[in-house]
């Protein structure tokens, strides 16, 4: 007799409140990168201001997943989320649909855990001061993830184009043991930080290499299209460059495409991705003074790693 299939879980953002751990999410990504390299495919449709993306992945030993979502730049003015969608998770052995996960839940944990995994492998171990550039949707989860996983962080500064937005973010954070402050002088803040984590929608650089002191780790999140970037050529040329995935960043995202086109760097300037970095003996930070840059480009394989972690936790 054929086995009766169980109905897939629908996991909303509210369902997961208080049940997920940033440390466990980062560990899920680390472990996921010890598995065979994922097969991934992306489809992007629509104009720059209203894009639909479908990102699919298969990871041997983990399963299959597909996330479809829209990104509408003008939704904030409408009182709607900029990003909306859902993630489907399928069983690795028989292809059953196991879970449908709210896209913002996957994206929040994937994005911040991706950056923090990179920082845990590349930032100086004595890093104490974290600067968050941007106070949008991602910023709060970055503060929570960094301070949960890197307990040495004692000070968190937040900069935003609209100072009140940075202040509102600070006031909305609770349970953070680090000192929190909104800052208005971005060049000075960058120059004082040990880790700079930038999550903006910038199409022109907001972080200049001239501002960054030796030993800083710079985490670049915001750019996800070919015309977007957050760092200037000078920073990219000075730094040891790493990415979460060569496949989803090189040739796809302006953060790398634009400095390659200008001749500031080459594709070979990228020294490794997370598959490389998690391996024992990998090329990571070489000195206390080296500047490291990690481009968080995302990808369906990361979504699948995090969605599978969420589904396991929620299944009890």
Swiss-Prot record:
Keywords: NAD, NADP, Oxidoreductase. Belongs to the ornithine cyclodeaminase/mu-crystallin family. It comes from the Bacteria. GO terms for cellular component: cytoplasm. GO terms for molecular function: oxidoreductase activity. It catalyses: L-proline + NAD(+) = 1-pyrroline-2-carboxylate + NADH + H(+); L-proline + NADP(+) = 1-pyrroline-2-carboxylate + NADPH + H(+). It comes from Paracoccus denitrificans (strain Pd 1222). Catalyzes the reduction of Delta(1)-pyrroline-2-carboxylate (Pyr2C) to L-proline, using preferentially NADPH over NADH as the electron donor. Is likely involved in a degradation pathway that converts trans-3-hydroxy-L-proline (t3LHyp) to L-proline, which would allow P.denitrificans to grow on t3LHyp as a sole carbon source. This is Delta(1)-pyrroline-2-carboxylate reductase.
């Amino acid at each position: 007799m054929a086995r009766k299939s169980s109905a897939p879980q629908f996991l909303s953002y509210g369902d997961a409140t208080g049940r997920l751990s940033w440390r466990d999410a980062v560990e899920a990504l680390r472990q996921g990168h010890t598995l065979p390299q994922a097969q991934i495919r992306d489809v992007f449709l629509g104009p720059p201001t209203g894009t639909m993306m479908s990102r699919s992945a298969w990871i041997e030993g983990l399963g299959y997943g597909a996330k479809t979502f829209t990104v509408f730049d003008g939704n904030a003015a409408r009182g709607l989320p900029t990003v909306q969608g859902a993630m489907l998770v399928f069983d690795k052995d028989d292809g059953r649909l196991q879970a449908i996960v709210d896209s913002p839940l996957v994206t929040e944990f994937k994005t911040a855990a991706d950056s923090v995994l990179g920082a845990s492998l590349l930032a100086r171990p004595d890093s104490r001061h974290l600067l968050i550039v941007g106070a949008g949707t991602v910023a709060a989860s970055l503060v929570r993830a960094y301070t949960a996983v890197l307990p040495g962080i004692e000070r968190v500064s937040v900069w935003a184009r609209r100072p009140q937005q940075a202040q509102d973010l600070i006031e909305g954070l609770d349970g953070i043991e680090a000192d929190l402050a909104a800052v208005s002088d971005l060049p000075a803040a960058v120059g004082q930080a040990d880790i700079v984590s930038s999550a903006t929608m910038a199409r022109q650089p907001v972080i200049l290499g001239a501002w960054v002191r030796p030993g800083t780790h710079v985490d670049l999140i915001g750019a996800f299209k070919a015309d977007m970037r957050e760092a200037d050529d000078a920073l990219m040329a000075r730094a040891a460059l790493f990415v979460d995935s060569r496949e989803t960043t090189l040739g796809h995202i302006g953060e790398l495409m634009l400095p390659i086109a200008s001749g500031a760097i080459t594709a070979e300037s990228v020294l490794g991705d997370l598959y490389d970095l998690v391996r024992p003996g990998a090329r990571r930070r070489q000195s206390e003074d080296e500047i490291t840059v990690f481009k968080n480009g995302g990808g369906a394989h990361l979504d699948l790693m995090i969605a599978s972690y969420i589904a396991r936790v929620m299944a009890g």
